[in-house]
Structures are given as structure tokens and as C-alpha cells.
Amino acid sequence: MKQKKIETDKIGLVGQAPSRRGDPCKPLAGPNGQKIARLAGLNYDELIACRRKHLNTHYSGKRGKGYRFDHAKGSVKAADVLLDWRVERIVLLGKNVARCFGFRDLPFLAEISIYGRRFLIFPHPSSTNRWWNERRNERRARQLLQRFLWGETVPAEFPKSRRSTRTPSQTSSTGTSANGSRATISRRKPSRFSRRSP
């Protein structure tokens, strides 16, 4: 029996920026793209056939253990993606990319359905991302990415109730994503004058 072909015209992948030696005109054409293709169970040509874009068009250098990222430029490019792309499913590679699309404080492997599209917040594939150090993370990421790309719904595993140790004025919503990591979304703006710990 022949396996159904993946619908690359319905899939988009959005990354932060090209690598130091990467070609700005070919998003995900290097090692990170190969890693995504391997995790997705796609051959490299299928990955390249999907819509692809970097939110920062050039490598910006390092900052600490990660990379510099221009959020203002990224947010403009994210708006362009929403306006221009006619795809059903978009994989956001990294939390910086997710923030540019307005998704803050959500865990990796969370799926969001909004704007008539589905988004998957996927860990940045770079080797500097320590999230990949745990085998169970990679196994779960592979499972969920493949399901998402084939159009299946990614299961969300948010608990029905969880005791909070916060005061009522610090109400927040806590949940567990499909990979078991926790996210907290606060409903209260932090005070400009909050005490800092010594």
C-alpha cells in the first residue's frame, strides 16, 4: 500500500535567522533544516517544498549562550507571514519566533488554533538549545511534529485542577503541555515598583 503524500503546500516553517554560514535566501537549508526533516519523517526535498521563512534575515551574532534576535523586525515579518501565506499549519521554531506571533509564556509543543490556522510551538533545532539533551523530549517532539504536519490534532494535556501557592491577587493559569513541561500565564501585570530580591 502506498503511503499518502504529505501536503507541503499546506505547511509553513518559521525560524529565527539563518546560521552564520547560512544563506538568507534559503531558510532551513542547513543542519537545522536537516534536523527538522529527520524529526518530521520527511525527506529533505519535502521539507524544502514547504513554505519557509526566517524572521530575521541575517545572522546577528551570539548573546550569552544563545543568539541575538531583533523582536521588532521579527514581529513585522510575522505579520507578513499571517497576511501572505495561505497555509493551514505553521511550525514556529523557538520561543522568540512564537513571541513574534503573539504567543507568550506557552510551553514547547503547544498547539494553538487561531486566525483559521494551526500553530505548533516547536523547540529551536539548534544544538545550543539544551531542551534537546533529554531523549524523551526528542521522542515526544518527533511524535507531535509528525502528527501536526500530517494534519492530525496534537493532544494537549492540561490538568483539570491544580492547587496554587500564589495569593488570590496573583491569579494565573498553569497547565502542562503535551511534553509534560509546565507553563504559567499570569493575568496580572507586574508592578514597576515590585521588590527585587537581594
Per-region residue spans from a language model:
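Short intrinsically disordered terminal tails
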Residues: 1, 164, 196-198
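A polyanion-binding, active-site-adjacent surface
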Residues: 1-110, 114-131, 135, 139-151
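Low-complexity, intrinsically disordered short peptide segments enriched in small/polar/basic residues
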Residues: 3, 8-11, 166, 182, ...
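Charged phosphate-binding loop/patch that engages nucleotide di/tri-phosphates or the phosphate backbone
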Residues: 137-180, 190, 194
